[in-house]
Amino acid sequence: METNQNEKGPSLPSYPAGGIMSVSNSNADTNQGVTQHPLANRIVNPNYYNMGFNPYSGFNSFIPSFNPFVPLETNLPGNGPISSLQVIESIVGAVGSIAQVLESTLMAAHMSYNTFVSVSENLNKLKSSIGAIFGIVSLLSRLKRLVLKFFKHSKIDEMNSQEYDVFEKEEGNHKNSIYSIVSSLAIILGLVGLPYAIIRLFKNIYEKEKQIQQAKIRKKIDSLEFCKADYEFMSRDPGVEMSLKKGDIIAILSKTDTQGNPCEWWQGRKRSGETGWFPSNYCSIISR
């Protein structure tokens, strides 16, 4: 195909047997997903050059056409229910995502509750252990008093049962107040410290994942090949081919066709974000 350019480029290479896939650009045709070859546009669109598969040609508008290929219209009556179903599907997906978020929140609350329960159980065990230790100390003091009383030691400070009960009650109240203070502090620390620890943990995980993704992107960019357009090339189908201007820098995305075989048509991406297929003999590889 001849192009409007000052310097005529080499002859275009032939398309591979496996074909090439259409690329979705912003200025591509709406039916480009159907075409995998530039000539397919003449099949899908019967008004291509106003000469589709019309046996009476497109120059005579008084003779009806017998084109078996019906053009793709977007305003057909059947597209209304399809769009409604798509809207319903998107709503159902949004509700499902909200349900997943609520479920994860409930699981986090349940885990926090289990953590508080385990902390309270450990505090009760600690209380029992401390009580046992104080009981042993009290028993030893009683044995000491009995031994001293048995040997009639002069420095015995005898205590009647009433005074001992009052002392034991005061000591028990003091222990209970200490236990209540410790329990309150543990609950406050759990309510404040546990969410902070979880947030810090997730933040560290997010930072590590971000660094890994950046390293992968950097590695992928380093492995890309770049080429420079030596000739101008006008695309024959915006849905498949990509236009080139002399001096354009293109990142090579693929050098194979749809079947994985090497071909002379390469898939690339320009700095503007446009992607498509272009002839390899119109460009030269940039050496690093």
Swiss-Prot record:
Residue span of region Disordered: 1-32
Biased composition (Polar residues): 22-32
Database matches in Pfam families: Peroxin-13_N, SH3_1
GO biological process per UniProt: protein import into peroxisome matrix, docking; protein targeting to peroxisome
Location (main, coarse): membrane
Membrane in keyword set: yes
GO cellular component: cytoplasm; peroxisomal importomer complex; peroxisomal membrane
All residue ranges annotated as the SH3 domain in the record: 222-288
Cellular localisation: Peroxisome membrane
CDD domains: SH3_Pex13p_fungal
Topology relative to the membrane: Single-pass membrane protein
TM helices/strands, residue ranges: 178-198
Swiss-Prot/TrEMBL keywords: Membrane, Peroxisome, Protein transport, SH3 domain, Translocation, Transmembrane, Transmembrane helix, Transport
Function (record text): Component of the PEX13-PEX14 docking complex, a translocon channel that specifically mediates the import of peroxisomal cargo proteins bound to PEX5 receptor. The PEX13-PEX14 docking complex forms a large import pore which can be opened to a diameter of about 9 nm. Mechanistically, PEX5 receptor along with cargo proteins associates with the PEX14 subunit of the PEX13-PEX14 docking complex in the cytosol, leading to the insertion of the receptor into the organelle membrane with the concomitant translocation of the cargo into the peroxisome matrix.
Entry's family note: Belongs to the peroxin-13 family.
Quaternary assembly: Interacts (via SH3 domain) with PEX14 (via SH3-binding motif); forming the PEX13-PEX14 docking complex.
Protein name as it appears in the record: Peroxisomal membrane protein pex13
Gene name for this UniProt entry: pex13
